[in-house]
């Protein structure tokens, strides 16, 4: 998984998630992302079943609480044997450090910076800052790096900024990936797999472009080809 492409399993339940995954041949299991919708609906059993079937799992819960609580949550989630887990960088340096200590190197921790759905104006108003999105992502990445996390989540448009200030092995995972003929949905800061690669992304998260396609396998293969 040098340059993983995660399919976001944004489905309401286990059955619809596996109905989708069964469209892929058994020898071509994609890496998958499980977010709040599916995890909160099904609980740990969705992760357990995915792992039993050989899927590599990225658990996207964006943990954001006081350091003690986040550390305890990370320790609990280690039992699920997922490969990646998200925390939110806005929780601060101490929270991220606590998560890193709790992970004990057994899981890749990814710090979410700014959501791909947020605009510059909304970020400034909500977070009461005069910074640009690029400045904010750079600052949050520097904190994440200081805390010892394994990588960040940002829009592909900020991947190059992150690449410039982090080591080569620091993961730069980018959602907000669309093909040229796709609708943006609720994401604002988006680009294509090819452009994300040019910007320096080391991994992609792709949801609706694949899950809502008439031929998901072909679209998945096309994205892999563009990104490799």
Curated annotation (Swiss-Prot):
Name the Gene3D superfamilies on file: Aldolase class I
Q: Where is the active site?
A: 62
Q: Which Pfam families match?
A: OMPdecase (PF00215)
GO molecular function terms noted in the UniProt entry: orotidine-5'-phosphate decarboxylase activity
Pathway per its UniProt entry is: Pyrimidine metabolism; UMP biosynthesis via de novo pathway; UMP from orotate: step 2/2
Keyword terms, alphabetized: Decarboxylase, Lyase, Pyrimidine biosynthesis
Its catalytic activity? Answer: orotidine 5'-phosphate + H(+) = UMP + CO2
Q: Name one GO biological process term.
A: 'de novo' pyrimidine nucleobase biosynthetic process
Q: Where does substrate bind?
A: 10, 33, 60-69, 116, 178, 187, 207-208
Q: What class of enzyme is it?
A: lyase
Q: What does this protein do?
A: Catalyzes the decarboxylation of orotidine 5'-monophosphate (OMP) to uridine 5'-monophosphate (UMP).
In terms of NCBIfam families, this protein maps to: PRK00230.1 (NF001273), pyrF (TIGR01740)
Subunit architecture: Homodimer.
Q: Give the family per the record.
A: Belongs to the OMP decarboxylase family. Type 1 subfamily.
Q: What is this protein called?
A: Orotidine 5'-phosphate decarboxylase
Q: What is the native source organism of this protein?
A: Oenococcus oeni (strain ATCC BAA-331 / PSU-1)
UniProt lists the gene as: pyrF
